[in-house]
Amino acid sequence: MSIRPDEISTVLKDKIANYESQVDVYEVGTVLYIGDGIARVHGLENVMANELVEFPGEIYGMALNLEEDNVGCVLLGEYSHIKEGDQVKRTGRIIEVPVGDDLVGRVVNPVGEPRDGKGPIEATDFRPVETRAPGVIDRKPVEEPLQTGLKAIDSMIPIGRGQRELIIGDRGTGKSAIGIDTILNQKDSDVYCIYVAIGQKKSTVAQVVDVLERHGAMDYTTVVAATADEPAPLLYLAPYAGCSMGEKFMHEGKHVLVVYDDLSKHAASYRELSLLLRRPPGREAYPGDIFYLHSRLLERAAKLNDENGGGSLTALPIIETQAGDVSAYIPTNVISITDGQIYLISDLFHAGQRPAVDVGISVSRVGGSAQLKGMKQVSGTLRLDLAQYRELEAFAQFGTDLDKSTQQKLARGKRTFEILKQDQYQPMPVADQIVIIFCATHGLLDDLEVEQIKEFEKFLLSYVKDNEPGIYQQVETGEKISDELEDQLKEVINKAKEQFKEEKELTG
């Protein structure tokens, strides 16, 4: 076998000409300490704040503390196999989450991984979890209503699209129920919903998802679940991730509702991270930037102007108080950031007044301008009537002889409170609310027994829809009620009342 030098040289030249060097360049560091979900890493000289870093076994962490000689990272997964001396790689990416239509109807964790067993999420669009809130010039005033379907809220504490309305109260007063009812009420509207569960039991989240599925609400809802057994960094990321998913729709000119359930646990998870990273503690051991934690989240709720698509993101943050103390650190912070609060009290809840809204301390600072004209008109005196009733009720407990007008106010107050009661998962269309609140504020329920009110409410609404659809359609527009329509409504309600009483006598 003869070797031909010219052939060898041709092959070598060809190989050299087509040689491509593939060198992967990483900036790597070394683990100095690992424990309690925190890693101290040396050598990541150019790492960015909040950058994603990769640990062995495809476990990711987030760089939170950039110190002189090391980086404090929080780990976003199981870290028992990571040890001192392991290599850590920079990714050059800030934490992002998948966004878009692929997430609608899904249950995901705060980094966008599916948790519902329905297969992978094929999202092609991603957004950083932390983004800047829209500027003053990009916004417009809140002017469109967001109906909750709850009479007590839509009449006295109206919420507008783009508003931030805090739901605050003790444990077990029905805070989550208001958030879920509001999501259920968006069924026939154009609002996408995102429910962010922070630090809740898996069984509770499963129950919420089941309710949403049974009522057909998962067709327009995404659930972001960071359950109680997840590491603190995931609980910390959850609301920002949910907000980013909503912002995608907002910037497309659509409308979004985000329920954060709840920000008390979110603050506790951030306190845990901060103390483990040895940041100096302040009041109630929270770090100094705890206000900024929530303000930068809630400022992302906005109503964009027409040049930016006119989309909106409405936020309903939930805060749990201890023994009704709204003057604690986190409650006062969030009250000052939001555009109003719905305050729920346990006394009303246990007395059977559900939703247990305290109308005296609850307020909506911007929602009034978004309220439907018809609702504004019929519920104008409602808050005052209820406040007077509460005062007189306390006075009447002394057993004093009361004059006729006081007795009348007490009787009307009882009936008004009765119509504001509502069962869970039964949001009411706004036209139904206007009709029934019209009855209360015009004294048309005064001659009925308190026990008959709920029954009469159902009877009246079906009577109006069946016998006077024209009147119902006029009310449905939400426009101001004319004198003529007011007279027609009174006439229809009185007819319905007569028929109701006759039927009662026959069956009684």
UniProtKB/Swiss-Prot annotation:
Keywords tagged on the record: ATP synthesis, ATP-binding, Cell membrane, CF(1), Hydrogen ion transport, Ion transport, Membrane, Nucleotide-binding, Translocase, Transport
InterPro entries: ATP_synth_asu-like_sf (IPR023366), ATP_synth_asu_C (IPR000793), ATP_synth_asu_C_sf (IPR038376), ATP_synth_F1_a_nt-bd_dom (IPR033732), ATP_synth_F1_asu (IPR005294), ATPase_a/bsu_AS (IPR020003), ATPase_F1/V1/A1_a/bsu_N (IPR004100), ATPase_F1/V1/A1_a/bsu_N_sf (IPR036121)
PROSITE patterns, sorted: ATPASE_ALPHA_BETA (PS00152)
Entry EC number(s): 7.1.2.2
Topology with respect to the bilayer: Peripheral membrane protein
Subcellular location: Cell membrane
Keyword Ion transport attributed: yes
SUPFAM superfamilies per the UniProt record, alphabetical: C-terminal domain of alpha and beta subunits of F1 ATP synthase, N-terminal domain of alpha and beta subunits of F1 ATP synthase, P-loop containing nucleoside triphosphate hydrolases
Ligand binding (ATP): G169, D170, R171, G172, T173, G174, K175, S176
Leading EC class: translocase
Site note Required for activity, residues: S362
GO MF annotations, alphabetized: ADP binding; ATP binding; proton-transporting ATP synthase activity, rotational mechanism
Functional summary from the UniProt entry: Produces ATP from ADP in the presence of a proton gradient across the membrane. The alpha chain is a regulatory subunit.
HAMAP family: ATP_synth_alpha_bact
Recorded family membership: Belongs to the ATPase alpha/beta chains family.
Subunit structure of this chain's protein: F-type ATPases have 2 components, CF(1) - the catalytic core - and CF(0) - the membrane proton channel. CF(1) has five subunits: alpha(3), beta(3), gamma(1), delta(1), epsilon(1). CF(0) has three main subunits: a(1), b(2) and c(9-12). The alpha and beta chains form an alternating ring which encloses part of the gamma chain. CF(1) is attached to CF(0) by a central stalk formed by the gamma and epsilon chains, while a peripheral stalk is formed by the delta and b chains.
Protein name: ATP synthase subunit alpha
